[in-house]
Amino acid sequence: MSKRLYYEEPYLQKFKGKILEKIKIGGKPALILDNTCFYPTSGGQPNDLGYIQGVSIVDVIEDNEKIIHVLKEGIEEECGDMVIGKIDWERRFDHMQQHSGQHILSAAFEKLWNADTVSFNLGDEICTLDIMKDNITSEEVKKAEILSNNIVLENKPIKVYFVDQEKANELNLRKIPPQKGDIRIVEIKDFDICACCGTHCGTTGEVGLIKILKWEKRGVKIRLDFICGKRSLKDYYWKNELIKNISNKLTIKDTELGEVVERMLEERKETRKELREIKEKLQEYEAKRLIDESSIRDNGIRIINKLFEEKNFQEVRGLVQEIINLDDSVVVLAGIKSKGEVEGAKILFACSRALKYDMNRLIREAGKFIEGRGGGAPNFAQAGGKKAEGIEDALNFALEHFQEFIKK
């Protein structure tokens, strides 16, 4: 059995321990000590990190009454049975802030909205809290956050102690764990009391700012993302810097940012609408120009055979669609070799719906010249391949096909 020093003194950073067992976990050396400061992963809280005899701890595992310390490498034999352990205090105190903050937040939601906590996870950057509530409003979240931070400001003592099962049943606990033996209680004076095995701050004031970042509905639950203490300060730093920089670039007050962004988004929406209308007019103009410049065959059919190098595929596709919509006796054979696109080749064959040519069949035959594949409808088909230098051969093949077809 390993004595858990963090139960008695969560602020203890360095300790001496006696090696009880040396084992292997996942091929890595591991130690079981008679006592330890290292908290194992449990109850939604990750394990502590740190060093034993200067060797890095990579994991801390709870195995019944034993605490297993998994090491990056073996320790020197010269140390004998006694070793010195030192925890990563920054990580430990961060976990204390987050876990105590969760207790405050859970109690706030329970008191205000009768929303029980279902689960809690202490992540590396964000903590999550799942509460039983069908829906939640911004105002409800705000009230819970305000209450939580008021409890922080009151600097209430956080008391940790053990009770037996009989005493636990008498306490107004949110949930009684099914474990046998004594139960560890974490109590925030005149605010919350619950069973918990984690490490906690000595007072609510040490938790620091509690900030709910976002929330979302998960079935019959609500999941809240939140941070506490130094994490909140870090979050405030980058957000404040971002707001300051954007405000300076726009030469406005930071309090005007929301209003200005709304106006800019509306202006962008209008600009995009105007740009779309201009592009549509230009597309129609270009389509008419290509139709007018194309030669008329003996049977009245126009053939437009063109390689596009300054347009992307979507632009050419829209233009070709415009052409066959404007003229009921036109055939378009288009190749696309655009700048800035992924290397390769694309061809697009189309004809007016009134014409009964099989563009799908033709595109499959011409696609061989670009080492590609494709298909589509009888009047509109496309293909893509990896041989860009074969585009002109594909277009010439298709043009010869139509010239021979028309002669017949």
Feature locations, PLM:
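Conserved nucleotide-binding/hydrolysis modules and their immediate coupling elements
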Residues: 1-81
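Active/ligand-binding-proximal structured segments within catalytic/core domains
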Residues: 36-52, 78-129, 379
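Divalent metal-coordination and catalytic microenvironments
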Residues: 43, 103-105, 129, 198, ...
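Glycine-rich, acidic loop segments that terminate in or are immediately followed by a histidine
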Residues: 195-207, 304-408
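A conserved active-site cap/scaffold subdomain adjacent to cofactor or substrate pockets
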Residues: 201, 205, 213-262
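Hydrophobic helix-and-loop "lid/oligomerization" segment in the mid-to-C-terminal part
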Residues: 241-343
